[in-house]
Structures are given as structure tokens and as C-alpha cells.
């Protein structure tokens, strides 16, 4: 998992250490008018790499309303555009989780795991404010969309699905 902000002083250095498609994607997203973009899923091609841009208007909710998720074919680049904050928790895929809903063979490329109380001991946590991004690789189980102690908040977020194969 990688965390950063497209507006901070170190953005160029942070982006430069990423695989080429992710670096290009961050620069592209930073230059787009995402606040006024239509919601939905859109195909996007950068340097010959086919990606999927998802633009969503959502509301955060408590941790127990979410299930841990993972992807295998895509790297998830999640960027908070406005609103929030949006809390993400994450932990490594150690192969011990119980599958609740496997949709890896669908275009959504998503698998949900059962919530387990013991994962709370190993979950990392980041709080996304506008401009913050989190990048999740296939080994990063993540739980986005959570509210902070102040309760549910509306937010707009981007999820850009970048093929893992393009990042190798």
C-alpha cells in the first residue's frame, strides 16, 4: 500500500518511484477536473495501457458496514477528490482470510472477505483528505469508505483500475 497527496511538496518524488503506469496516472488525475466529472465507470488509455476510471459520489459509514476487499488483476489507485474525510484500513493478505464473495472472474475483479475481530489488531489506518491517494496492490487487503469519529460524511472519490501486468 502506498499513500500520498497530489498537492504536497514531495509529489514529484513520490510519483517518480512508482511503476510507469501509476506515475502517469497520478499526473493525469492531478490535471483533470475531477470535481465536475460525470459519475460512472469510463475506459481510459494512457501510453497504450487500458485502465478503468470510476468516479463515485458516496457517503462514509462505520467500519462494521464494510468488508475487507482485494483485487488480483488490477492495482487500485484511490483518490479523494472532495468531502470526507474517508478512513481506509488495510492489512497484508496472509492467506488466512475466509472468502465471503468471490467476483475475481468478473470485470469488477473483487473478492470480499469475512470480517474477523482479530484483524483489528493488525489493520493499518490512513485518513484521506481531498488530494490524498492510496494505492492498493493485489496483496493489500483494504477496507475503504469508513467514517471517522465525527460520523458519516459525503465524499467524491476516484478509483483508477490499473492492470497489474502493466506495472511489472
Residue ranges and their predicted role:
Residues 72-86, 92-94, 103-118, 161-162:
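Short, conserved beta-strand element in jelly-roll/cupin
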Residues 126-147:
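Conserved metal-binding segment of the jelly-roll/cupin
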Amino acid at each position: 500500500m502506498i499513500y500520498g497527496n497530489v498537492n504536497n511538496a514531495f509529489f514529484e518524488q513520490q510519483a517518480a518511484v512508482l511503476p510507469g503506469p501509476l506515475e502517469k496516472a497520478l499526473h493525469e488525475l492531478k490535471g483533470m477536473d475531477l470535481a465536475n466529472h460525470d459519475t460512472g465507470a469510463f475506459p481510459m488509455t494512457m501510453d497504450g495501457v487500458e485502465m478503468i476510471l470510476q468516479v463515485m459520489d458516496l457517503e462514509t459509514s462505520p467500519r462494521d458496514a464494510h468488508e475487507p476487499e482485494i483485487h488480483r488483476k488490477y492495482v487500485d489507485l484511490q483518490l479523494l477528490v472532495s468531502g470526507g474525510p474517508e478512513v481506509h484500513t488495510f492489512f497484508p493478505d496472509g492467506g488466512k482470510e475466509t472468502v465471503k464473495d468471490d467476483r475475481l472472474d468478473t470485470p469488477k475483479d473483487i473478492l470480499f472477505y469475512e470480517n474477523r475481530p482479530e484483524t483489528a489488531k493488525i489493520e493499518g489506518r490512513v485518513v484521506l483528505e481531498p488530494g490524498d491517494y492510496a494505492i492498493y496492490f493485489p496483496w493489500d487487503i483494504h477496507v475503504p469508505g469508513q467514517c471517522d469519529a465525527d460520523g458519516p460524511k459525503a465524499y467524491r472519490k476516484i478509483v483508477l483500475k490499473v492492470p497489474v501486468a502493466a506495472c511489472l
